[in-house]
């Protein structure tokens, strides 16, 4: 089977009154990334919960990570836990993405994405922290997707890449 794990959803589902939830709110409202130690700790805890509840089987399931690793350090620290088969790099014009993310925030009541200035700051964080992750993995494992296209076209591109990887002819 296939299991999708979004680090953003993982953080947004935290109780804002909990230690990790309040830390996430502190960073996300400023457009900053949660420190690697806390992110990895939460990821490992979440994965253990999924495995213990039967939602994920390391022997049977393919895990789609969304939003993690967010830094080269996270990639290095996760290397012992995951075997990366493929990395989808969704690339688009920054201002178009700011508008899209802002619109989604309003529709889905996602406060961490509601302020366009905060979203722009996250793009700066991406350039500084996340873009180097692309250099960590071999180029042969990276596929770039035009995320500036219409959402259905983006989905089509992703499905096409996954079909080639999962069901080679």
Per-range role (PLM):
Residues 1-2, 81-86, 138-142:
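Short glycine-/polar-rich loops that comprise or flank the Walker A/P-loop
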Residues 26-28, 77-130:
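A glycine- and Lys/Arg-enriched "phosphate-lid" helix/loop adjacent to the NTP-binding pocket
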Residues 46-53, 81, 104-107, 129, ...:
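Conserved, well-folded catalytic cores of nucleic-acid-processing
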Residues 3-77, 107:
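ATP-dependent small-molecule kinase phosphotransfer cores
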Residues 65-68, 90, 116, 123, ...:
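Conserved phosphate/pyrophosphate-binding and hydrolysis machinery centered on Walker-type P-loop NTPases
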């Amino acid at each position: 089977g296939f299991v999708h794990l979004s680090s953003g959803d993982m953080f947004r589902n935290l109780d804002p009154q909990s230690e990790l939830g309040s830390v996430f709110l502190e960073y996300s409202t400023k457009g900053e990334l949660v420190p690697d130690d806390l992110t990895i700790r939460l990821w490992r805890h979440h994965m253990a919960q999924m495995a213990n509840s039967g939602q994920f089987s390391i022997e049977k399931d393919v895990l789609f990570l969304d939003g993690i690793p967010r830094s080269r350090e996270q990639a290095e620290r996760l290397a012992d836990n995951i075997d990366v088969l493929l990395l989808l790099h969704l690339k688009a014009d920054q201002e178009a993405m700011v508008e899209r993310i802002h619109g989604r925030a309003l529709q889905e009541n996602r406060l961490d994405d509601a302020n366009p200035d905060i979203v722009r700051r996250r793009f700066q964080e991406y350039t500084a922290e996340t873009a180097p992750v692309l250099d960590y993995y071999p180029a042969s494992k990276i596929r770039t997707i035009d995320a500036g296209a219409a959402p259905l076209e983006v989905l089509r591109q992703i499905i096409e890449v996954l079909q080639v990887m999962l069901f080679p002819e």
